[in-house]
């Protein structure tokens, strides 16, 4: 086998490989011999078909089939010999594939880029310093109460937190528009479900009131024909209801699976969950800063094959989310461009973290793997069952090992980075958009 390597452009490489004619011809003849033993051809007894007949009928297709197999095998041998690390599958082109002649073909593919890590100590991180306070716990209990609140009809003027049942008809430029009309619509004031200004205009109304309100659609509204448009809505209020929060007592605790210990036991359990979620959120915030700093400090050529693969993964995930929400017949065709930027980011992160792992010779820490599994399992009713499920599923274990290795790489980068601790509150970390 003769091999030559050519750099075509960027990360693209082309191997030209020549395989001696005798090697190809021997495989073709052996394959044709097998066919002659099994193939039924009119006018000949099984196993008695003359080689010339087999060659005439099957020679061309068999040679193409054999050539494809030889190209695959010799490509693998060539990249091992040349110490080349391809990113993605190669494309093959046979330049010469005739009886009695050497099989010459080209394999075009991309390689992984050379990644050089630098200035890791310049990555700046603000690490949140935060605990779960009694006030945070009290606020969480109010949230839990609201999750189990009931409603009581009233006749007073509405305020934030109340629920309205209303009809509305919207118009833009005097014309009704699609999606602008509803009857018996339930609206919780303060939930932010409607366009800006709508809830404010109906707050203070009471059952039986009718009014026409004026609002403006935001410039970034999803419907192109309504962006920035002034609108009028005719409103009819049918019913108003105020929230009734449940008492925080033993019965309330039982709603969350606490059969013994009452409210105090519930506070302990909720506090544990909050602390676990807070730890994960802080870790995620630090990781985001590390990754952003790593990306900003490095330029990396990205193999288009890897980006394409990642686009396909992201698009498939998006389609799966849509499938649970709408009729498969109406599923949209999602263009690759929607996912390209995210795919490029993910590929770049993978290449950089892969280099961190390689340079520092990081190995999977099984203790960390077990901690990650235990943390994931703790959110379920029967953690032992979840842990056992992971232990018996090789694919899930591999995924968790990859997560652990990635976390080890991030932790190493944090050690090298400039880290400053900054005091923060539970809400700032858990609800950053509410700031």
From Swiss-Prot:
Primary location class: cytoplasm
GO BP, sorted A to Z: 'de novo' cotranslational protein folding; cell division; chaperone-mediated protein folding; protein transport; protein unfolding
Gene coding for it: tig
Subcellular location as annotated: Cytoplasm
Catalytic activity: [protein]-peptidylproline (omega=180) = [protein]-peptidylproline (omega=0)
Keywords attached to this entry: Cell cycle, Cell division, Chaperone, Cytoplasm, Isomerase, Rotamase
UniProt cross-references to InterPro entries, sorted A to Z: PPIase_dom_sf, PPIase_FKBP_dom, Trig_fac, Trigger_fac_C, Trigger_fac_C_sf, Trigger_fac_ribosome-bd_bac, Trigger_fac_ribosome-bd_sf, Trigger_fact/SurA_dom_sf
Record remark: domains: Consists of 3 domains; the N-terminus binds the ribosome, the middle domain has PPIase activity, while the C-terminus has intrinsic chaperone activity on its own.
HAMAP family recorded: Trigger_factor_Tig (MF_00303)
Name of the molecule in the record: Trigger factor
GO molecular function: peptidyl-prolyl cis-trans isomerase activity; protein folding chaperone; ribosome binding
Bilayer-spanning residue ranges: none
GO CC terms, sorted: cytoplasm
Originating organism: Colwellia psychrerythraea (strain 34H / ATCC BAA-681) (Vibrio psychroerythus)
Function: Involved in protein export. Acts as a chaperone by maintaining the newly synthesized protein in an open conformation. Functions as a peptidyl-prolyl cis-trans isomerase.
Residues forming coiled coils: none
Family according to the record: Belongs to the FKBP-type PPIase family. Tig subfamily.
């Amino acid at each position: 086998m003769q091999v030559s390597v050519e750099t075509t452009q960027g990360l693209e490489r082309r191997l030209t490989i020549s395989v001696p004619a005798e090697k190809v011809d021997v495989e073709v003849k052996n394959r044709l011999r097998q066919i002659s033993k099994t193939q039924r051809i009119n006018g000949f007894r099984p196993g008695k078909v003359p080689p010339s007949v087999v060659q005439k009928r099957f020679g061309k297709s068999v040679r193409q089939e054999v050539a494809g197999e030889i190209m695959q095998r010799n490509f693998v041998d060539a990249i091992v010999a040349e110490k080349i690390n391809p990113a993605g599958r190669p494309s093959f082109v046979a330049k010469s594939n005739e009886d009695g002649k050497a099989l010459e073909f080209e394999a075009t593919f991309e390689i992984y880029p050379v990644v050089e890590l630098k200035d890791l100590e310049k990555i700046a991180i603000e690490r949140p310093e935060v605990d779960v306070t009694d006030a945070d716990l009290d606020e969480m209990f109010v949230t839990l109460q609201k999750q189990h609140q009931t409603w009581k009809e009233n006749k007073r003027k509405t305020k934030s937190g109340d629920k309205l049942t209303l009809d509305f008809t919207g118009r833009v430029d005097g014309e009704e528009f699609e999606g602008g009309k509803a009857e018996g619509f339930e609206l919780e004031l303060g939930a932010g479900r409607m366009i800006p200004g709508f809830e404010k205009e109906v707050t203070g109304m009471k059952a039986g009131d009718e009014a026409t309100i004026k609002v403006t659609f935001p410039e970034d509204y999803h419907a192109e024909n309504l962006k920035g448009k002034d609108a009028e809505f005719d409103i009819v209020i049918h019913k108003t209801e105020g929230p009734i929060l449940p008492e925080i007592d033993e019965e309330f605790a039982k709603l969350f699976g606490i059969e013994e210990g009452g409210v105090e036991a519930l506070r302990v359990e909720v506090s544990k969950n909050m602390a676990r979620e807070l730890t994960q959120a802080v870790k995620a915030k630090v990781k985001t800063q590390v990754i952003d700093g790593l990306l900003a400090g490095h330029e990396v050529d990205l193999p288009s094959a890897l980006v394409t693969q990642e686009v396909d993964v992201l698009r498939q995930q998006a389609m799966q989310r849509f499938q649970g929400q709408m009729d498969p017949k109406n599923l949209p065709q999602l263009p690759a461009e929607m996912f390209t930027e995210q795919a490029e980011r993910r590929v770049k992160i993978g290449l950089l973290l892969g280099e961190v792992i390689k340079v520092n010779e990081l190995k999977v820490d099984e203790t960390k793997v077990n901690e990650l599994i235990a943390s994931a399992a703790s959110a379920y009713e029967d953690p032992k069952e979840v842990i056992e499920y992971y232990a018996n599923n090789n694919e899930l274990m591999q995924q968790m090992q990859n997560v652990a290795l990635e976390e080890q790489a991030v932790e190493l980068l944090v050690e090298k980075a400039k880290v400053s601790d900054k005091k923060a509150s539970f809400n700032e970390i858990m609800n950053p958009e509410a700031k």
